[in-house]
């Protein structure tokens, strides 16, 4: 005998596509994926940089190792944490939906692509990928804030 949980009163049925796009809990709120990838970056970047400074490894990338470390800790790690916080906070402040599912996943992939570009791409590509996330997130947050009508 199988039991099923009845749907919540007044709940609309969920389309299969929506379940696929929004069903993975990590992609339901902005802080979840961004905090995870930021923590992974810190766990990889700090030991790698220390190893490079001690001469144990040679880093071949678009920028010098000292600049890369400073840049990734400030504009990689910190930006990931701040973007995750703000996407979640704007939803809490306004009650309106911020990116989730595939849209949130695309923002995370863009952040990851910028981190990998330091190693795999020429400097101009690295620079463009690194710069483009913040304006995109700013526009997303501005649209949600304006739609909410909150004047504070």
Language model feature labels by segment:
Residues 1-152:
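Hydrophobic alpha-helical transmembrane segments of multi-pass integral membrane proteins
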């Amino acid at each position: 005998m199988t039991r099923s949980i009845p749907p919540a009163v007044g709940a609309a049925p969920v389309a299969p596509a929506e379940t696929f796009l929004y069903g993975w809990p990590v992609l339901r709120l902005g802080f979840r994926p961004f905090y995870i990838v930021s923590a992974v970056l810190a766990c990889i970047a700090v030991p790698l940089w220390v190893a490079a400074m001690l001469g144990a490894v040679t880093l071949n990338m678009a920028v010098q190792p000292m600049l890369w470390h400073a840049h990734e800790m400030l504009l990689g790690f910190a930006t990931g944490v701040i973007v995750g916080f703000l996407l979640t906070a704007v939803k809490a402040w306004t009650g309106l939906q911020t990116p989730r599912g595939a849209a949130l996943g695309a923002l995370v992939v863009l952040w990851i692509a910028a981190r990998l570009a330091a190693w795999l791409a020429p400097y101009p590509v690295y620079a463009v990928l690194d710069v483009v996330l913040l304006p995109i997130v700013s526009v997303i947050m501005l649209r949600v804030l304006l739609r909410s009508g909150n004047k504070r």
